[in-house]
From Swiss-Prot:
The lineage of its organism: Bacteria, Bacillati, Mycoplasmatota, Mycoplasmoidales, Mycoplasmoidaceae. Binds 1 zinc ion per subunit. Pfam families: Ribosomal_S14 (PF00253). This is Small ribosomal subunit protein uS14. One of its GO terms (cellular component) is small ribosomal subunit. It comes from the Bacteria. The gene is rpsZ. Zn(2+) binds at C24, C27, C40, C43. One of its GO terms (molecular function) is structural constituent of ribosome. It comes from Mycoplasma genitalium (strain ATCC 33530 / DSM 19775 / NCTC 10195 / G37).
Length: 61
């Protein structure tokens, strides 16, 4: 889980736009964030298995 200080730091506007980075809206993780859904891969997996994301299901071939 992300530290509280990092979440606060990310919510403030950056001085330079290059410093912007995405964080998971659910847990605050900074890596492996799926921009289309706004959550990290771990939260995406949990939500997909729970059926909370419409149109997403486990692939098998």
């Amino acid at each position: 889980m992300a530290k509280k200080s990092l979440k606060v730091k990310q919510s403030r506007p950056n001085k330079f736009s290059v410093r912007d980075y995405t964080r998971c809206l659910r847990c605050g993780r900074a890596r492996a964030v799926l921009s289309h859904f706004g959550v990290c891969r771990l939260c995406f997996r949990e939500l997909a298995y729970a059926g909370a994301i419409p149109g997403v299901k486990k692939a098998s071939w």
